[in-house]
């Protein structure tokens, strides 16, 4: 795919950008393959040697990524996959800050432009103020009907292949909230304000047993908190501080999806920055010099451990 390849035009009334994002990024193997591709893997044998993956699973995922324009026919990265760097950088920063076992082993990031070790800051491109989950207003866009956003793949039991993918991941907690279609859809719904079990089930069409498992996982890792107003009322599931901190991951993933998968009736989700009142275009900036980041200017001390190209 050439660098100036246009975005994919989605079918009217079909899956929207969120649905396409969940289908591509809401899959542990896809994330791991893309991670390795951005770190230099470009041959089938390299993916096989770096990941505990079977030939059949690798062949299927590579075919999907080629068909979706994230890899070329010879497994080189494309503009579409290279533009995922803000998502990966946001994942890295969230795990560094919020997952205790990572705090002393993740390598530092250096901003080549200013030469300083830095942390990425999500900010509003219009007013340049830092933004987090509490400063954002998430609203359903013209193409944002849940029937078009929810995962299209049928659910299935977790297989040994999926367990191997999770064990291979450098960021297991992120995989728990993004590396599965239903989990990623649940995260989107939570940011849109959904909090009741029945509302999650109705909006997403997720089987009750799967929803129960995902909600429990989100609570176990501290992304959601479950509260009940009274003994007769069912729990409400709300984003914790750790959950709201996933705004950077979600926003960069949504912006990537809505850049590359365009519905004729408009975006699936519209974000507004409460601070300035403008529609949000998020960007990552260096917390040391304040300049906007670009992928080519981010250096890491140990690229293999970082998972960032």
Where are these regions (language model features)?
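N-terminal helix-turn-helix DNA-binding core of bacterial DNA-binding proteins
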Residues: 16-54, 169-210
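Basic, amphipathic "hinge/linker" alpha-helix immediately C-terminal to the N-terminal HTH DNA-binding motif
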Residues: 26, 74-90, 94, 231-252
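Short, Lys/Arg-enriched N-terminal segment that forms or immediately precedes the first helix
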Residues: 2-22, 151-175
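Conserved catalytic core of two-component sensor histidine kinases
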Residues: 59, 212
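C-terminal regulatory/oligomerization modules of transcriptional regulators
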Residues: 96-163, 262-309
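A short, conserved structural fragment
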Residues: 66-74, 219-229
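Alpha-helical linker/hinge and terminal dimerization helices associated
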Residues: 68, 93-99, 221, 256-260
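Short, hydrophobic-biased segments on the C-terminal half of alpha helices
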Residues: 62-63, 215-216
